[in-house]
Swiss-Prot record:
Produces ATP from ADP in the presence of a proton gradient across the membrane. The catalytic sites are hosted primarily by the beta subunits. Keywords: ATP synthesis, ATP-binding, Cell inner membrane, Cell membrane, CF(1), Hydrogen ion transport, Ion transport, Membrane, Nucleotide-binding, Translocase, Transport. InterPro entries: AAA+_ATPase (IPR003593), ATP-synt_VA_C (IPR055190), ATP_synth_F1_bsu (IPR005722), ATPase_a/bsu_AS (IPR020003), ATPase_alpha/beta_chains (IPR050053), ATPase_F1/V1/A1_a/bsu_N (IPR004100), ATPase_F1/V1/A1_a/bsu_N_sf (IPR036121), ATPase_F1/V1/A1_a/bsu_nucl-bd (IPR000194). It holds the Pfam family ATP-synt_ab_N. It is an enzyme of class 7 (translocase). SUPFAM superfamilies: C-terminal domain of alpha and beta subunits of F1 ATP synthase (SSF47917), N-terminal domain of alpha and beta subunits of F1 ATP synthase (SSF50615), P-loop containing nucleoside triphosphate hydrolases (SSF52540). ATP binds at G157, G158, A159, G160, V161, G162, K163, T164. One of its GO terms (cellular component) is proton-transporting ATP synthase complex. This is ATP synthase subunit beta.
Length: 470
């Protein structure tokens, strides 16, 4: 097949119009390439993706890199396929960009296979209908807001409350306990944070179990709107071809929507509520529906969600909520108490916190833990004004147990060993349930609350109490 060439007719920011000969229009989502001397000296170094057919043998495309330096009349090459990214084990330990090129200066990927970034969601007949919990080894998550295998989890939290450390611990635990791989999509991230994550993953030894795909804040909107899809294709390969349970991290899903809204106006679409793109729900659906369990494997995704101006009704976070199975809310108040992971046990939710999925014992203990913590929260005003002495004996007991539970929800992480000096702990679900049921039953009312801080199992707490008593 002979090469198909067109030429640039118009450049509008990140959007480029290209004219082709009659009958040779490339289809929607096809990749085109053009030479941009402002990027580097390579020929055909800028990738464009066809977004619209304008009539008059012209297509409107979105650029995946800078368009500075392009001129009208320049030659554009039709690649004959959509944007494709390398897939397979060779991508592990590497950083790729939106078009699958390595950006870590460690040479070519050397992959055998590529996947297109736009793929169909798995057919109904291939989807797994089994609902089961996905054990993370993190007590507060497994007990109170368990993740579903193949589910979608929203991770909410401001700056500096430990989102990245939690993400790294999950990558570490899935690699060591499940032997699984992780894919990290940095969507509209700060470049510094992306670099920090890479360095920290290298130091904590989890880098060779993860593939990283970055489209940072300084990238044009085309790259930021597509980088999540590139990462998803890499994850789909591990699920479908290798039968893996994959973890997909997206940080930040809001930036995916934001990039879509930047491009949307340039494409000539009339904006909808709050200036977002009219195709907001469709774009989100196309991404989220591909994240699921099939009869071969699963993709479980953890998505950090930025909430603009703390307004949960904003169309961007509101659209993301519709797809979530669980939410993990990180709280600054809890971080200030020195309790890490700073997960809010009363604010975090899960669709599978249900006796039919997790069993009656787990459900009962989780609800009792939440009841005790809520009671303590209600009593805090009285304690602040009148002091502990004014409480009834029953309330004093509730407060004592709640404080022990609060401390016991903390846990040393493997990836933070260098900072905390204490070895990380992976806690099995049965040990988590046993520990909390014993605290609630009052078996450890005689132990000091400090014994429960930063330990794994209840046995470790008892051991720590004996050391403190010496």
């Amino acid at each position: 097949m002979s090469q198909n060439f067109g030429k640039i007719s118009q450049v509008i920011g990140a959007v480029i119009d290209v004219e082709f000969e009659p009958g040779k229009l490339p289809p929607i989502y096809q990749a085109l390439r053009v030479t941009n001397p402002a990027i580097d000296d390579q020929e055909f170094n800028l990738v464009l993706e066809v977004a619209q057919h304008l009539g008059e043998n012209a297509v409107r495309t979105i650029a995946m890199d800078s368009t500075d330096g392009l001129v009208r009349g320049q030659q554009v090459k039709d690649m004959g396929k959509q944007i494709s990214v390398p897939v397979g084990k060779k991508t592990l330990g590497r950083i790729l960009n939106v078009i699958g090129e390595p950006v870590d200066e460690m040479g070519p990927i050397g992959n055998e296979k590529e996947y297109g970034i736009h793929r169909e969601a798995p057919a109904f007949v291939n989807q797994s209908t089994k609902v089961e919990a996905f054990t993370t080894g993190i007590k507060v998550v497994d007990l109170l807001a368990p993740y579903a295998r193949g589910g979608k989890i929203g991770l909410f939290g401001g700056a500096g409350v430990g989102k990245t450390v939690l993400i790294m611990e999950l990558i570490n635990n899935i690699a060591k306990q499940h032997g699984g791989f992780s894919v990290f999509a940095g969507v509209g991230e700060r470049t510094r944070e992306g670099n920090d994550l890479w360095m920290e993953m290298k130091e904590s030894g989890v880098l060779d179990k993860a593939a990283l795909v970055y489209g940072q804040m300084n990238e044009p909107p085309g790259a930021r709107a597509r980088v999540a899809l590139s990462a998803l294709s890499i994850a789909e390969y591990f699920r479908d071809e290798e039968g893996q349970d994959v973890l997909l991290f997206v940080d930040n899903i809001f930036r995916f929507t934001q990039a879509g809204s930047e491009v949307s106006a340039l494409l000539g679409r009339i904006p909808s509520a709050v200036g977002y793109q009219p195709t907001l729900a469709t774009e989100m659906g196309e991404l989220q529906e591909r994240i699921t369990s099939t009869n071969k494997g699963s993709i479980t995704s953890v998505q950090a969600i930025y909430v603009p101006a703390d307004d949960l009704t904003d169309p961007a976070p509101a659209t993301a909520f519709a797809h979530l199975d669980a939410t993990t809310v990180l709280s600054r108040q809890i971080a200030e108490l020195g309790i890490y992971p700073a997960v809010d046990p009363l604010d975090s939710t899960s669709r599978i916190l249900d006796p039919q999925v997790i069993g009656d014992e787990h459900y009962a203990i989780a609800r009792q833990v939440q009841y005790v913590l809520q009671k303590y929260k209600d009593l805090q005003d009285i304690i602040a004004i009148l002091g502990m002495d004014e409480l009834s004996e029953e309330d004093k007991l509730v407060v004592a147990r709640a404080r022990k539970i609060q401390k016991f929800l903390s846990q040393p992480f493997h990836v933070a060993e260098a900072f905390t000096g204490s070895p990380g702990k992976y806690v099995e679900l049965k040990d988590t349930i046993k520990g909390f049921s014993e605290i609630i039953a009052g078996k450890h009312d005689d132990l000091p609350e400090q014994a429960f801080y930063m330990v794994g199992t209840i046995e470790e707490a008892i051991e720590k109490a004996q050391k403190l008593a010496v």
